[in-house]
Amino acid sequence: MEPGALNSRVEMANFIEVNSIEKLEKLFEESNEKPVVLFKHSVTCPISSGVYYEVSEVETDVNLVIVQKARDISNEIANKTGIRHESPQAIVLKNGKAVYHASHYDITAEDIQRVESGE
C-alpha cells in the first residue's frame, strides 16, 4: 500500500449547486423520471463539513443547496416536502415526493445510495 493511501478519499458524487427556484422546480419534475438527491449544506458548520465528505461517496448527482446562499431554496424545499429545515440535511425525491430524509450524523452515503438505486 502506498504511503498516505489510508487517508486518501475518492469523491464519487457529482455535486451540482442549486441556485434558483426554477432549478429546484426542474428537479422536482425530474424526480418523476429518476430519483433526485438533495443535500442542504452549511459552509460554516463543522458537522455539515464532515457529512459533506460522507455524501461525496454517493455514486450519483447530488444537488447541493448551500443554505447561506440559498435560504429561499431551502425554505421552498421545506414547503414542498413538509420536512422541517435542518442542515446538514439529505433528501431523496421520487415522483415529486420525499422518500428519504435524514439530518446531521444520521446521513449516510449507504442509505442515500440504497434509496436512490431503488433497493
Q: What feature does the model see in each segment?
A:
Residues 26-58:
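Local sequence-structure signature of Cys/Sec-based thiol-disulfide redox active-site neighborhoods
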Residues 58-63, 111:
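Short cysteine/histidine-rich metal-coordination sites, predominantly Zn2+-binding motifs
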Residues 94-119:
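Non-catalytic, surface beta->alpha helical segment in thiol-disulfide oxidoreductase systems
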Residues 2-4, 9-32, 119:
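N-terminal leader/targeting and pre-domain segments
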Residues 81-94:
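Structural micro-motif
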Residues 40, 61-76:
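Thiol-based oxidoreductase modules, predominantly thioredoxin-like and allied folds used
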Residues 47-51, 69-73, 77, 88, ...:
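Amphipathic alpha-helical interface surfaces
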